Amino acid sequence: MIDKNELLAWLAEKDKRLEKEMTLVAVGGTAMTLLGLKSSTIDVDFCLSAVERKIFEKMMTKQDKKWKIDLFTDGYIFSEQLPYDYADKAKEIKRLDHIVLKALAPVDIIITKAARLNARDEEDIAALVKFVNKDELIKRFEKVVKTYAGREEEYRYHFQIILKRFFN
């Protein structure tokens, strides 16, 4: 498990090797850990631009293999394409010399978790709902659902479960 301090220390080391600024948007459990909603995460998930991803991947070392690190590109997270403003909506966590670290907005975390919706996702959603407006969530979901790479009916079904369990 990786806590917030370990994650920030790791990123500070990466920051020293960069020459240009890049924005890392933490997603999933990584975002929740940075937001203080979970004590730790089992893996590291970031979304960044395609150009920044190539730079970040080149900085990866053998030591980085101690963690499972997933990099997503241009708002395409797991199986959904988030709206273009996902990075603007994300909360800034820390600004280093070259890395701007953000955490995906709670509304967008719920939308990404709706695709899989397992027991761990439901626990995470329970921690997020107090920070999310139901109407905003529904509008955001309708923007994203058409981009879903899986079966849209299943994604809609999971979303309805979330609305019933957490927003009624």
Please give the residue ranges for each predicted region.
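Compositionally biased terminal segments of proteins
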Residues: 1-168
